[in-house]
Amino acid sequence: MAKEKYERTKPHVNIGTIGHVDHGKTTLTAAISKVLHEEFPDVNPEYDFNQIDSAPEEAARGITINIAHIEYQTEKRHYAHVDCPGHADFVKNMITGAAQMDGAILVVAATDGPMAQTREHVLLARQVGVPKILVALNKCDMVDDEELIELVEEEVRDLLDENGFDRDCPVIHTSAYGALHDDAPDHEKWVQSVKDLMDAVDDYIPTPVHDLDKPFLMPIEDVFTISGRGTVVTGRVERGQLAVNTPVEIVGIRPTQQTTVTSIETFHKTMDACEAGDNTGLLLRGLGRDDVERGQVVAKPGSVTPHTKFEGEVYVLTKDEGGRHSPFFSNYRPQFYFRTTDVTGVIELPEGVEMVQPGDHATFTVELIQPIAMEEGLTFAVREGGHTVGSGRVTKILA
């Protein structure tokens, strides 16, 4: 049976849920899809809550590890929704997930208020350039004291303000559990709160202006083999557009390879073309599963080149922001997280700079052990032992 065609009728927006583990991100994601399925059944499939927590060991631990993508529509827009992991060891995925957001719903339990990971996620959202955050104050059904809810709300607004987000953003009081379960007390009230949340998302998160006129580039997040058809790479198109049967290059990590895209899919529907902002799978002609890997990019031939040496401007996180406790010196070898992968690099501080302290804004040279598809202005995170210790941008390519 031929797959359905993807219809591009409404503006497309990428959003996601971020926040502390156990504050109800995945439950809220399920509640949103259920409420929208009931309101607009023609355009919204029914998702199973257990589908979102996609790996079996997560279900056992009750935590979301892989980033789960679902799609849904409001009256105004088509959304792709990533349910981001809440656990500190999965911050790396958070970076790949959050980088794909045009806006985020910060989920905070009214019973707890902002916790360590709430702060870390807001900080990461700022680092990776999420433009807008609004708040779902969850578990309001478990707090009788309205004043307590208002105190938590004030605390969340302060946290957003401290990290450069709008403190006057919409804050919706909700209960994801109450909206998800038909027999929950005040079910209708909580269903309405989820509708209010999505109205706020429609109005508050701006429709992104995607870079359609720039040369095509898609960072590879995952690689699959489809038997009898070939190798598929998936990711979110960063810029430009691409039609079926167009030649492309695979750039970074290894020597640059030429291939042709023979099929394009999104959410299991085939497309004639994809464009900036689409979550897409590309079928590559003549390449095997082991010829491509996460961290490479698919790009218009000649538009981007691989480099190993650059000068960067970096903000080094303080201890309180989850960064290092001590300074670093020349020859420090952390990982540099570009788009979808970590590459080890050696730092060389400029002459006259002996060390860089947590909290510093620094400029230094980096030499990577593998080439990355790189341009001036490209952002990266500096990571060490699984923790983000800095964020920066490439100011000058040296080699």
UniProtKB/Swiss-Prot annotation:
Q: Which family does it belong to?
A: Belongs to the TRAFAC class translation factor GTPase superfamily. Classic translation factor GTPase family. EF-Tu/EF-1A subfamily.
What PANTHER family does the annotation carry?
Answer: ELONGATION FACTOR TU, MITOCHONDRIAL, ELONGATION FACTOR TU-RELATED
Q: Where is this region: G1?
A: 19-26
Matching SUPFAM superfamilies: EF-Tu/eEF-1alpha/eIF2-gamma C-terminal domain, P-loop containing nucleoside triphosphate hydrolases, Translation proteins
Enzyme class, first EC level, given as a word: hydrolase
Q: Which residues bind Mg(2+)?
A: 26
This one is known as Elongation factor Tu
According to the record, the residues making up region (G2) are 62-66
List the catalytic activities from the record: GTP + H2O = GDP + phosphate + H(+)
**Keyword Metal-binding among record annotations:** yes
Q: Which organism is it from?
A: Bifidobacterium longum (strain NCC 2705)
Renumbered residue ranges of the record's region G5: 175-177
